[in-house]
Amino acid sequence: MSTFFSDTAWICLAVPTVLCGTVFCKYKKSSGQLWSWMVCLAGLCAVCLLILSPFWGLILFSVSCFLMYTYLSGQELLPVDQKAVLVTGGDCGLGHALCKYLDELGFTVFAGVLNENGPGAEELRRTCSPRLSVLQMDITKPVQIKDAYSKVAAMLQDRGLWAVINNAGVLGFPTDGELLLMTDYKQCMAVNFFGTVEVTKTFLPLLRKSKGRLVNVSSMGGGAPMERLASYGSSKAAVTMFSSVMRLELSKWGIKVASIQPGGFLTNIAGTSDKWEKLEKDILDHLPAEVQEDYGQDYILAQRNFLLLINSLASKDFSPVLRDIQHAILAKSPFAYYTPGKGAYLWICLAHYLPIGIYDYFAKRHFGQDKPMPRALRMPNYKKKAT
């Protein structure tokens, strides 16, 4: 009996050790961001051996290790090997940081910028390696996109382009959807959605050569409805759906597609105070008199406080987004969706799985708690008139 117990004990000790060691070796070759999985695996080992019989405990644990090993195999990062990538919106913010980050990793970077003679483009030329090329690329102008394609194709020759990262975007003026001008809706769609589609369609022939990656930067606002973001959220929701459809269609070509849905990062997408003043003036100049009377000028002008709120709450550390984009570009089996940023994954899950009434309650409490009331709703006799 003691010999049997001793043999069983050694088996129960040796098998998990070997399996855990194998999985850990595979883990070290992966992206290095999966430590929580290792903790869960160790916990599973203890549960299996303590609750189940040694035989069934080892069987269940072995199956779990096999599944974990298979999963981690897909998370291994491919070598950079000066793979060529295109990044749009490289002038400032996330796109600017991404161009520098990928250049440091050893990629051949094509940085599409709105102004090739602007300070952002000049800084990229000054601080990055000779592998980085700056391209004039206003993604709302098909001529510039086609010209950029010709330059990239000529420089790559037969190499192919490994990844296209559609990052360029605009926020517009965050306020009630009724107050937004149609020009704001059209501008958000032109840059955030149609620009993404135009760049994708133009550069897909180069992606097919390499069987590479298409990475579209969407937003948490494209997956979870939030007040003040009618134009922006709608355009980003279109980007998310476009990415999902392209993921299905491009799989036959060996191209993998990922959608990045960040939340809460301090980029320059919100614009400057001068830009906001111009947008405020445009709204006040073009709103119908009845609408302006109901909302009140003070309500419209108070929306600029949202800019201060964004700047105070957003993170200046882009590293979670940069790591996720790196994973989407280099992982053998990238995820379809990435949600970097504080609360991004949570809010998207709440929007999809909570009853609508409950989600609306939490969204209004969180995103609209400091929002002023329109003028008409502040009138004491408004409800009496409504009834």
Swiss-Prot record:
Query: Could you name the Gene Ontology cellular component terms for this entry?
Result: endoplasmic reticulum membrane; intracellular membrane-bounded organelle
Q: Which Pfam families match?
A: adh_short
Which UniProt keywords are listed?
Endoplasmic reticulum, Lipid biosynthesis, Lipid metabolism, Membrane, NAD, Oxidoreductase, Signal-anchor, Steroid biosynthesis, Transmembrane, Transmembrane helix
Q: What enzyme class is recorded for this protein?
A: oxidoreductase
For this UniProt entry, the molecular function terms from Gene Ontology, in alphabetical order, are:
17-alpha,20-alpha-dihydroxypregn-4-en-3-one dehydrogenase [NAD(P)+] activity; estradiol 17-beta-dehydrogenase [NAD(P)+] activity; testosterone dehydrogenase (NAD+) activity
Spell out where the chain crosses the membrane: 4-24
What does the record give as the reaction this protein catalyses?
17beta-estradiol + NAD(+) = estrone + NADH + H(+); testosterone + NAD(+) = androst-4-ene-3,17-dione + NADH + H(+); 17beta-hydroxy-5alpha-androstan-3-one + NAD(+) = 5alpha-androstan-3,17-dione + NADH + H(+); (20S)-hydroxypregn-4-en-3-one + NAD(+) = progesterone + NADH + H(+)
List residues binding substrate: S219
UniProt-listed Enzyme Commission number(s): 1.1.1.62, 1.1.1.239
Q: Which domain of life is it from?
A: Eukaryota
Q: In which tissues is it expressed?
A: Expressed in placenta.
**Which biological process terms from the Gene Ontology are attached to this UniProt entry?**
androgen metabolic process; estrogen biosynthetic process; in utero embryonic development; placenta development; response to retinoic acid; steroid metabolic process
**Regions annotated as coiled coil:** none
Q: What does this protein do?
A: Catalyzes the NAD-dependent oxidation of the highly active 17beta-hydroxysteroids, such as estradiol (E2), testosterone (T), and dihydrotestosterone (DHT), to their less active forms and thus regulates the biological potency of these steroids. Oxidizes estradiol to estrone, testosterone to androstenedione, and dihydrotestosterone to 5alpha-androstan-3,17-dione. Also has 20-alpha-HSD activity.
Can you state the subunit structure given in the record? Homodimer.
Query: What protein family is recorded?
Result: Belongs to the short-chain dehydrogenases/reductases (SDR) family.
Q: What is this protein called?
A: 17-beta-hydroxysteroid dehydrogenase type 2
**Gene that this polypeptide is encoded by:** HSD17B2
